[in-house]
């Protein structure tokens, strides 16, 4: 009797453990930022407050993009399991620890990708589906398989796929693309190198041990810090484009300038005097920078007309 009673809790524990392993493959925090950026693109694509049907499309698009992004993350874990096992930052991943087989991981990734593509095809539109699939290929194949192990410019070139979420969101709501989503894409594209290189600075030993040609490993600490500073300056200029192009108003411009000065300040201090603590702070600030920048753009989209006294 005692063994019978003990079975359900044990089975539940096993099921929960397996669920956590598959969930970890999807890199939830990264995917959350992807969906957030896509959602910003969706909301900016609609003048005023979205209608109820538009909210339905936005929900379906968010689910579809989330599924495909999760599939790309799982495929990345599959390909990089040997590399991940050599790095402290990633050694905990289920594939690196051998907790999930290659077949399980690949099947999971294919299932997620197929489900996401189906959602986008049925409830959103074909343009969004194909753009999302192209983004999947860009990250899972071009970046993960070809670029990351081959060149220190992997982050720069591969960053194009990571910059696509606002374009996907815009396409979902409009069914077409203009200049606006590509401006948002450019901002993320320029944000990606200083963001990841700040991380790579204090994880350089990890990357060297794994044999990955990240910029601090191939070109050294000083060169990487200079590149972070230069990219941050260019990024600052790019963040002003929504105002210049007429996508936003003064509220966004003030926020973009404040955040840009903050990011440049972190990059400048890191360039002048390196420390691991400074690199960590710069990395963390970069996340806040992008999140708050897009949040300010969204607030300006809705509050701007009220502040200007226009409907």
From Swiss-Prot:
It is an enzyme of class 2 (transferase). PROSITE patterns: UBIA (PS00943). Pathway: Porphyrin-containing compound metabolism; heme O biosynthesis; heme O from protoheme: step 1/1. Gene3D superfamilies: UbiA prenyltransferase. Its main location: membrane. One of its GO terms (molecular function) is protoheme IX farnesyltransferase activity. The chain crosses the membrane at residues 30-50, 55-75, 108-128, 129-149, 153-173, 182-202, 233-253, 287-307. The keyword Cell membrane applies. Its EC number is 2.5.1.141. It comes from the Bacteria. One of its GO terms (biological process) is heme O biosynthetic process. The keyword Cytoplasm does not apply. Belongs to the UbiA prenyltransferase family. Protoheme IX farnesyltransferase subfamily. HAMAP family: CyoE_CtaB. Carbon 2 of the heme B porphyrin ring is defined according to the Fischer nomenclature. PANTHER family: 4-HYDROXYBENZOATE SOLANESYLTRANSFERASE, PROTOHEME IX FARNESYLTRANSFERASE, MITOCHONDRIAL. This is Protoheme IX farnesyltransferase. It comes from Methylibium petroleiphilum (strain ATCC BAA-1232 / LMG 22953 / PM1). The gene is ctaB.
